[in-house]
């Protein structure tokens, strides 16, 4: 789900923009769309849908997001009418691609279990430091990128809500980063 973030995150313009941008980029990568956050109608409209929902304190499911892509809760994007900026047939095409992911049997597993909560992942329970391991080898490249993007965006948003400390609170270890972080010369 695309759960509404805490007020601490949403009140910080940079944090909110980073979270929305990363979430939308991850979602679009899942359906093979490479989108420029400043120029791509797909990215801009999905970002506005998320921002509107979260500013109203609303959690969105993928189903709701797809429905709102077909019939967005706004009529203008910038100064242009929505249908001029991103025509309804193009929105429907993207909605169909997202719906195909939602309807696939392999994606059904994503809807099961507890939603990922960085607070739950990082907070000691009964004096024991939690260890969480995410095994992603069975996922396609697009699914891995989607999951990693959402996880890292949620972790970053969570850490921005915490006060400073001199003690280590958590450690993120990312093994086998090939394909995520390009090598440098």
Task: Go through each PLM region and give its residues.
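P-loop NTPase motor domains
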Residues: 1-185
């Amino acid at each position: 789900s695309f759960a509404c973030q805490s007020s601490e995150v949403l009140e910080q313009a940079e944090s909110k923009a980073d979270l929305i941008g990363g979430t939308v980029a991850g979602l679009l990568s899942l359906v093979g769309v490479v989108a420029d956050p400043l120029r791509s109608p797909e990215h801009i409209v999905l970002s506005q849908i998320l921002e509107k929902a979260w500013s109203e304190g609303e959690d969105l499911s993928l189903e709701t997001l797809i429905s709102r892509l077909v019939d967005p809760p706004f009529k203008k994007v910038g100064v242009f009418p929505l249908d001029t900026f991103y025509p309804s047939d193009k929105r429907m095409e993207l909605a169909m691609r997202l719906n195909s992911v939602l309807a696939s049997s392999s994606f059904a597993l994503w809807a099961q279990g507890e939603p990922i909560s960085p607070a739950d992942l990082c907070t000691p329970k009964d004096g024991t430091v939690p260890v969480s391991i995410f095994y992603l080898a069975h996922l396609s490249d697009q699914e891995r990128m989607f999951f990693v993007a959402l996880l890292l965006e949620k972790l970053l948003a969570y850490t921005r809500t915490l006060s400073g400390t001199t003690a280590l609170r958590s450690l993120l270890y990312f093994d086998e980063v090939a394909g995520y972080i390009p090598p440098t010369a």
